[in-house]
């Protein structure tokens, strides 16, 4: 027996024979061991053929195992050291197999030759197993021809090339017949263009090019559905569309040339079909370079000749970037394909697509999807989710909203969960009290037993209600699944012209199921507001998902948020004292945006805050972030003093290709991409280079900016605040007046125009001038600073009282109109905080003490009460 003439699978089977013999304690390898080895091979040819014959491979295995168990076993110490020998019959199988191989005109002995040899030689155990499972040689040869076709075994691994299309692809037309594909709505123009190209004599290979998620694969599925319905020209009727899986084609190809063998086998099957099979390669750019090793051809070069001759009907799908990067580089491959550009559908088209898919999602999740949820998904995803494309992002929204509602149905309602926890807690308390004998414990035990009895009754009633509602929802899901299956059967019956069956299902089963579904839905509606479970996906759920994805609040305003927005000005003024005009402008911009009345193409607001140092410009931005987001973390702060050089603009949007930091992205663009709903503070803008401001023009006008990788960053949900000290000397001369007078405003504006270009200033929503703080306002700021000290000391359980005289001294000693409120803060830190800290460290004061801050002769004194 020449081992080189055996295929890899036969060599593997011989090795497996020895393992099987050792496992069953047999001293010799016989034909039954070989039979067991070849029917146990994973993805093997013999199990595949037996399956095609209708035999149960697992039953055959069990019968073979029983036969192996009956064979004589050799046990003991001597048996372990003894060698395992092959019987004469075992050798005869390969001699016979070689003859069968020659009859088949094959170059190697393959597993099918071995199987046929086993059928001829073993008339005992193997014959009885085959007879028992109705496996005859004649039927085996018939199934073998189906799988093998006219192929010869001319390689050591022929099994990888048998039935190649079914192994490495998926029949989309078959899936469409089985009602497995999602319905394709619209896209008629694109499908017609694909049909037109497929109908050509040569170069009949369309390639669908479009952004990810616009529905390229769906168009091919739509074509498969049209072929099933017969809604195609005569030349495409009864064609098969096979979706080729490049991953499984490459996977497991260990040896050189194995990948090419598999691909050639696929192409041979397509060629033999004489145009009946259309190959669909999703992500077609993967064929360029696939299987490429030193001196070998890649998949792209293997299919080129067939594409040019028109022997291979192929549909490709890829994105613009990948097409440019891989296909366009290879001009010979590019000219063999005809481009079909797939554009993103409009919002209205996306709504139609979602309406078509609605029923599938309802069946999958077992929920009811309202039409307003579908409209909201299309509109909100288009407006707020950037960087992705319709209809994919809208479908994802509906899918996740459905999953969220389903999860709530499957989880125990909060009310019932809390009740069960309370019962559990009281049961533990009851057990503990039952061991006590005092009067109080007995009284408490009686009270608990009574309360526990009531709670258990309530739990019983609520659990029954929950189970009933859940069963109703599950019942609807099952009925809808059944209805969908029946509709698939109707389509099949109509295709096969079985009109009696179609009519029976259409006018008998369908109305009956629809009536049952309606009855169950009415039962759920009767629960109304008292229902424990909600099985509806509404606009609210979709809005919540958008908010979770983007961080932008798009859900309907709840009462708490309404009050918060209406009190926004007051909340801001608690921290930013004396700047009413600035606070009002910012608050109004936020309210307009939240009500949905802002300009959709611009940021929520873009402001320049002008004024002397220490009057609250930066503080207003921080306070706005704190009030709106409950944290200052959502403020994106960029200190413009770091952008004094012309080239430093690249730090905002990212370095150009080839420069250090290209992969890291820009400080501004990356921050906004992660948190699109935020306050962006550009501090001290007059310090930056004038060219840096050119990138702001697009942000202010269109609410967008393109980063170094070509990604569009959306600023439409940001508040942009810039602070500057330009013209502060003019504003300082305005002190004591409640508002900035017109003359001062003109002087400041003239200075501002001298520093910034008109196109920059013209795009701003508002230029707000902060006036210097008056003595009255200083008093309020002192209160804010002192309140901070009180809150710090409260943690240490120390209280402080501050006399009015002390506040006057702080104002006189700490306030400087030129420097604003910052010197006040420093004065309070140096005099009050430092003094209290020293008293605490030295042990003069301890927890529970009350301190009194008094003032006299321009000095502060701190005494313990």
UniProtKB/Swiss-Prot annotation:
Pfam families: AAA (PF00004), AAA_2 (PF07724), AAA_lid_9 (PF17871), Clp_N (PF02861), ClpB_D2-small (PF10431)
Location of region: NBD2: 561-772
Residues covered by region (Repeat 2): 86-150
Gene Ontology terms, MF aspect: ATP binding; ATP hydrolysis activity
Region feature (NBD1): 163-344
Compartments reported by the entry: Cytoplasm
Keywords from the named record: ATP-binding, Chaperone, Coiled coil, Cytoplasm, Nucleotide-binding, Repeat, Stress response
Region feature (Repeat 1): 6-71
Region (C-terminal): 773-865
Entries under SMART domains matching the protein: AAA, ClpB_D2-small
Oligomer and partners: Homohexamer. The oligomerization is ATP-dependent.
Description of its domains: The Clp repeat (R) domain probably functions as a substrate-discriminating domain, recruiting aggregated proteins to the ClpB hexamer and/or stabilizing bound proteins. The NBD2 domain is responsible for oligomerization, whereas the NBD1 domain stabilizes the hexamer probably in an ATP-dependent manner. The movement of the coiled-coil domain is essential for ClpB ability to rescue proteins from an aggregated state, probably by pulling apart large aggregated proteins, which are bound between the coiled-coils motifs of adjacent ClpB subunits in the functional hexamer.
Protein name: Chaperone protein ClpB
Lineage: Bacteria, Bacillati, Bacillota, Clostridia, Eubacteriales
């Amino acid at each position: 027996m020449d081992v080189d003439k055996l295929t890899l699978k036969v060599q593997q089977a011989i090795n497996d024979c020895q393992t099987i013999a050792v496992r069953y304690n047999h001293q010799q390898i016989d034909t039954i061991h070989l039979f067991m080895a070849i029917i146990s091979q994973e993805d093997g040819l013999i199990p595949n053929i037996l399956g095609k014959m209708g035999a149960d491979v697992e039953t055959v295995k069990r019968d073979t195992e029983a036969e192996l168990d009956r064979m004589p076993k050799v046990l003991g110490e001597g048996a372990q050291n003894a060698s395992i020998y092959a019987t004469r019959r075992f050798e005869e199988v390969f001699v016979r197999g070689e003859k069968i191989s020659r009859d088949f005109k094959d170059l190697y002995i393959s597993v099918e030759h071995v199987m046929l040899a086993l059928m001829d030689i073993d008339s005992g155990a193997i014959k009885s197993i085959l007879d028992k499972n109705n496996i005859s040689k004649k039927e085996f040869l018939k199934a073998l021809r189906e799988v093998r076709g006219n192929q010869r075994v001319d390689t050591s691994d022929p099994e990888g090339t048998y039935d190649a299309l079914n192994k490495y692809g998926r029949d989309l037309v078959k899936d469409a017949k089985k009602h497995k594909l999602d319905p394709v709505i619209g896209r008629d123009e694109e499908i017609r263009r694909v049909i037109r190209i497929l109908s050509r004599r040569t170069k009949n290979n369309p390639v669908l090019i479009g952004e990810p998620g616009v529905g390229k694969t769906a168009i091919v599925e739509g074509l498969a559905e049209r072929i099933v319905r017969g809604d195609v020209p005569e030349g495409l009727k009864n064609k098969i569309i096979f979706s080729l899986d490049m991953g499984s084609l490459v996977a497991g190809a260990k040896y050189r040339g194995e990948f090419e063998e598999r691909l050639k086998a696929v192409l041979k099957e397509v060629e033999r079909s004489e145009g009946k099979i259309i190959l669909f390669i999703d992500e077609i750019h993967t064929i360029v370079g696939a299987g490429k090793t030193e001196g070998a051809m890649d998949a792209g070069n293997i299919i080129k000749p067939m594409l040019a001759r028109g022997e291979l009907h192929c549909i490709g799908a890829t994105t613009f970037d990948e097409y440019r990067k891989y296909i366009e580089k290879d001009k010979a491959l590019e000219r063999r394909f005809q481009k079909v550009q797939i554009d993103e559908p409009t919002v209205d088209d996306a709504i139609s697509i979602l309406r078509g898919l609605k029923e599938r999602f309802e069946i999958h999740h077992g929920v009811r999807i309202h039409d307003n949820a579908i409209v909201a998904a299309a509109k909100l995803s288009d407006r707020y989710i950037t960087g992705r494309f319709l209809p994919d992002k809208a479908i994802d929204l509906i899918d996740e909203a459905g999953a969220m509602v389903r999860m709530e149905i499957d989880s125990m309602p909060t009310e019932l969960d809390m009740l069960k926890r309370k019962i559990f807690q009281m049961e533990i308390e009851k057990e503990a009290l039952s061991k006590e004998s005092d009067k109080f414990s007995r009284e408490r035990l009686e009270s608990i037993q009574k309360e526990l009895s009531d709670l258990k009754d309530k739990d019983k009633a609520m659990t029954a209600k929950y189970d009933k509602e859940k069963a109703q929802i599950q019942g609807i899901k099952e009925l809808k699944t059944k209805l969908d299956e029946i509709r698939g059967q109707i389509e099949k019956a109509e295709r096969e012209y079985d009109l009696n069956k179609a009519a029976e299902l259409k006018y008998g089963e369908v109305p009956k199921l629809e009536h049952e579904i309606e009855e169950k839905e009415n039962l759920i509606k009767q629960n109304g507001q008292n229902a424990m479970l909600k099985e509806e996906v509404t606009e609210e759920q979709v809005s919540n998902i958008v908010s979770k994805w983007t961080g932008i609040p798009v859900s309907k305003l709840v009462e708490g948020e309404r009050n918060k927005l209406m009190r926004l000005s007051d909340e801001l003024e608690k921290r930013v004292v004396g700047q009413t005009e600035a606070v009002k402008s910012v608050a109004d911009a936020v309210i307009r945006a939240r009500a949905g009345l802002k300009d959709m193409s611009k940021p929520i607001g873009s402001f320049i805050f002008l004024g002397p140092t220490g009057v609250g410009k930066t503080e207003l931005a921080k306070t706005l972030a704190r009030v709106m987001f409950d944290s200052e973390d959502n403020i994106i702060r960029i200190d413009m003093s770091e952008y004094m050089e012309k080239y430093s603009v690249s730090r905002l949007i990212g370095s150009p290709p080839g420069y250090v930091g290209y992969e890291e992205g820009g400080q501004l663009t990356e921050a906004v991409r992660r948190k699109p709903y935020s306050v962006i503070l550009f501090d001290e803008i007059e310090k930056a280079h004038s060219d840096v401001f050119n990138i702001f023009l697009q942000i202010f006008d269109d609410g967008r900016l393109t980063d170094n990788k070509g990604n569009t960053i959306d600023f439409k949900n940001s508040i942009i605040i810039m602070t500057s000290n330009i013209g502060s000397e003019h504003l300082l001369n305005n002190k004591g007046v409640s508002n900035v007078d017109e003359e001062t405003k003109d002087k400041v504006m003239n200075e501002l125009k001298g520093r910034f270009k008109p196109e920059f200033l013209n795009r701003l929503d508002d230029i707000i001038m902060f006036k210097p703080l008056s003595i009255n306002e200083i008093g309020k700021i002192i209160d804010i600073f002192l309140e901070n000290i009180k809150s710090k000391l409260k943690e240490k359980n120390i209280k402080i009282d501050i006399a009015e005289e002390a506040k006057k001294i702080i104002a006189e000693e700490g306030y400087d109109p030129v420097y604003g409120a910052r010197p006040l803060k420093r004065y309070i830190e140096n005099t009050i905080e430092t003094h209290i800290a020293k008293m605490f460290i030295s042990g003069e004061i301890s927890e529970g003490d009350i301190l009194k801050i008094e003032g006299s002769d321009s000095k502060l004194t701190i005494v313990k009460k």
